[in-house]
């Protein structure tokens, strides 16, 4: 109901305005017969105003507004939607002309009128008659005694509602009309946002938003709908295992109407109707969602846990990564975290994981993490082809099965070097957004494939500020509530990567009241040992216990056991290897230690070649102040560890690649720690040239 536009809600229309004959247009009282005036007019006359025109000097002639019949208000016909005035809620046209009513999907028995004629669809036939659907929730029966001809499932029929029985059953009879008007009967429900639905349990509501996930179950079809305040799951049932609303896929803008219920403590809408929107209305909803996402995605303002010029210089880049991750969460875009399979990479990834999982559950429900999040380790110190192929296959499968967006790829402790290029070129083809948080020496060529790239080398820092340190602070930007549970992770990362940066000492001191340095060292070793056996699995439960996210006694027990096993394996390996280490003094005074890991080390067990070379290097550095380089090699690889030598391993790899034709040299890593690969037949040439290059470097 609203004001009549024809009369501006007055109920009358002015048709003429003329001069008052009593006062000649002056508005002043003249000589008049007081006995002929009413009390009000008498008061006006005594006050000097003309009682005929009320002092205006003119007489206004009006007539009743025909549009609203003098009511000043108009109604909307419940059947045809046209404006009318008067009593009731149906216009005169609809009451006089024969009409057949077509109920919308939202209509129920409360919208029925006994004696009215409706259009329906035959849903099923039985011996005693035919069932007819008048809407999604309204069904009646035509008894066989009232059927003069055969009807089949799917036939459109016109039926008169003869009676609504006490048990709610509808008694229908078929009718035939030569002239009639189809009148669509719509029903609207109040629109809410997803964040308001908890108070609407048991009610029928409408929401508008964007479909971000479609999942077909053995029963209903589950649509996940995103609006400006969050997401809600909507269950639509056609038949068991049959896709409901097949015309609606992910990214569609829709309105959904249905009953609000709780399922496993999560809000769910039991869909009564779902309509796809296009044009201006869809654009408005889309823009509203985007604006809300942009505001919600802003990361939290935090103070870093330790003082660091490098971290301070990286803050803007870290905020950009945090915002991109938060946006993925709140828009229900899947997130894939890739990390190097060592203590630094694992703590970096787990810090982010602990920050985002509560938000993912909050946005998408208790099982959302299984649809919108995955973490995978990378064995190589770069994002290699086996990683990207697996990630793309998983992403495309999820897109085909559930209509999901392609994921946001978050790479930590990897992703900065030329070796990552082949994989990044594939992400570009598929339109997968990539952000990198790393501390390996970066190659600028990768940045063209990345949305964001945070690396201490970009601001004058170096590998001493590890990925675990950066991601610990990044996680707090994403979700500050996880600070207390993850603040020991940067210290574990520092010890695992043997960082000597001042930030390492600061993070270790930060948690000294809870963890001894030896405790943190043990956690780092346990992570390295577990990572070796986990291979491509994320091992979330085991890793959480190692990092003390579960029961304290279990944490202590598993760390102690894994460290005993790891140290035993390392000692066995060194007992075998140390007698076979060959040492020579290079021209620059460097002590070069070389071991053939192919022939003089246990293979396919812990510690792997890189860890073995590192342990040998540490032992050889004890009690030795000279510059030391340890080179562990196999048929087609070499692992380099160094101390006191100004090395740049990525640059050395490029030089070897250019100088030794046919050697197929590639590799990289940090400036002073890395690995090189080459073809087996050129091993002697590569190692000889490598030794020459090391002997010509500056030492300190």
Which sequence ranges carry the predicted segments?
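Short boundary/loop segments of OB/S1/cold-shock single-stranded nucleic-acid-binding domains
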Residues: 95-115, 148-150, 179-203, 244-245
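Structural detector for short beta-strands of small beta-barrel domains
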Residues: 112-126, 157-161, 201-218, 258
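OB-fold (S1/OB) nucleic-acid-binding surfaces
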Residues: 126-128, 133-142, 213-240
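Short nucleic-acid-contacting surface segments enriched for D/E, G, S/T with interspersed K/R
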Residues: 147-158, 240-257
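OB-fold/S1-family single-stranded nucleic acid-binding modules
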Residues: 167-189, 261-288
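N-terminal small/polar loop signature for handling phosphorylated ligands or for N-terminal nucleophile
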Residues: 235-237, 344, 358-435, 442-445
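A structured phosphate/pyrophosphate-recognition subdomain
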Residues: 330-337, 341-342, 444-599, 616-617, ...
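Glycine-rich, acidic loop segments that terminate in or are immediately followed by a histidine
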Residues: 480, 593-700
């Amino acid at each position: 109901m609203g004001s009549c536009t024809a009369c501006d809600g007055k109920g009358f229309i002015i048709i003429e305005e003329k001069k008052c004959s009593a006062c000649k247009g002056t508005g002043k009282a003249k000589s008049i017969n007081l006995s002929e005036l009413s009390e009000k007019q008498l008061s006006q006359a005594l006050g000097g105003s003309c009682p005929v025109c009320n002092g205006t000097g003119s007489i206004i002639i009006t007539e009743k507004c025909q549009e609203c019949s003098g009511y000043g208000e108009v109604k909307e016909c419940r059947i045809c939607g046209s404006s009318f005035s008067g009593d009731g809620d149906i216009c005169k046209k609809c009451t006089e002309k024969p009409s057949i009513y077509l109920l919308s999907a939202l209509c129920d028995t409360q919208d029925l009128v006994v004696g009215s004629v409706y259009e329906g669809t035959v849903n099923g036939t039985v011996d005693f008659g035919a069932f007819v659907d008048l809407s999604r929730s309204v069904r009646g029966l035509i008894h066989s005694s009232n059927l003069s001809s055969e009807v089949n499932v799917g036939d459109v029929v016109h039926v008169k509602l003869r009676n609504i029985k006490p048990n709610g059953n509808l008694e229908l009879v078929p009718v035939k009309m030569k002239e009639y008007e189809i009148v669509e009967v719509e029903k609207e429900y109040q629109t809410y946002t997803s964040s308001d639905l908890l108070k609407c349990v048991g009610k029928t509501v409408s929401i508008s938003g964007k479909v971000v996930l479609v999942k077909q179950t053995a029963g209903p079809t589950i649509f996940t709908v995103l609006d400006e305040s969050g997401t809600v799951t909507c269950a639509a049932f056609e038949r068991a295992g049959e896709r409901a609303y097949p015309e609606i896929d992910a990214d569609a803008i829709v309105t959904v109407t249905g009953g609000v219920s709780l399922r496993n403590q999560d809000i769910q809408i039991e869909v009564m109707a779902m309509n796809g929107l296009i044009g201006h209305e869809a654009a408005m909803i889309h823009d509203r969602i985007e604006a809300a996402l942009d505001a919600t995605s802003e990361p939290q303002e935090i103070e870093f846990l330790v003082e660091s010029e490098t971290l301070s210089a990286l803050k803007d880049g870290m905020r950009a990564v945090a915002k991109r991750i938060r946006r993925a969460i709140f828009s229900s875009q899947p997130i894939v975290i890739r990390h190097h399979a060592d203590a630094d990479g694992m703590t970096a990834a787990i810090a982010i994981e602990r920050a985002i999982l509560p938000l993912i559950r909050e946005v998408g429900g208790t099982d959302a993490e299984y649809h919108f999040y995955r973490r995978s380790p990378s064995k190589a110190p770069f994002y290699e082809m086996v990683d990207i192929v697996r990630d793309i296959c998983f992403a495309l499968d999820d897109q085909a099965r559930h209509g999901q967006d392609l994921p946001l790829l978050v790479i930590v402790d990897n992703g900065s070097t030329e070796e990552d290029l082949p994989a990044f070129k594939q992400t570009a083809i598929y339109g997968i957004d990539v952000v990198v948080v790393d501390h390996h020496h970066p190659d600028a060529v990768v940045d063209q494939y990345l949305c964001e790239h945070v690396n201490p080398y970009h601001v004058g820092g170096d590998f001493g500020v590890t990925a675990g340190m950066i991601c610990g602070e990044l996680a707090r930007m994403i979700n500050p509530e996880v600070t207390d549970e993850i603040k020991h992770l940067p210290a574990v990362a520092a010890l695992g990567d043997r960082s000597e940066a001042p930030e390492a000492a600061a993070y270790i001191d930060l948690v000294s009241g809870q963890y001894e340095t030896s405790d943190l060292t043990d956690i780092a070793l346990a992570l390295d040992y577990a990572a070796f056996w986990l291979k491509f699995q994320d091992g979330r439960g085991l890793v959480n216990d190692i990092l003390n996210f579960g029961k304290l006694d279990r944490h202590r027990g598993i760390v102690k056991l894994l460290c005993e096993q790891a140290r035993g394996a390392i000692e066995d390996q060194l007992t075998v290897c140390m007698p076979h280490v060959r040492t020579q003094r290079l021209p620059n005074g460097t002590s070069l230690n070389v071991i053939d890991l192919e022939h003089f080390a246990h293979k396919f067990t812990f510690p792997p070649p890189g860890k073995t070379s590192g342990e040998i290097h540490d032992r050889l550095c004890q009690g030795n102040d000279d510059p030391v380089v340890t080179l562990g090699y196999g048929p087609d690889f070499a692992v380099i560890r160094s101390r006191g030598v100004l090395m740049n391993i990525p640059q050395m790899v490029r030089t070897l690649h250019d100088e030794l034709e046919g050697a197929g040299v590639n590799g990289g890593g940090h400036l002073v720690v890395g690995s090189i690969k080459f073809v087996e037949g050129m091993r002697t040439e590569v190692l000889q040239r490598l030794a020459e290059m090391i002997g010509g470097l500056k030492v300190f």
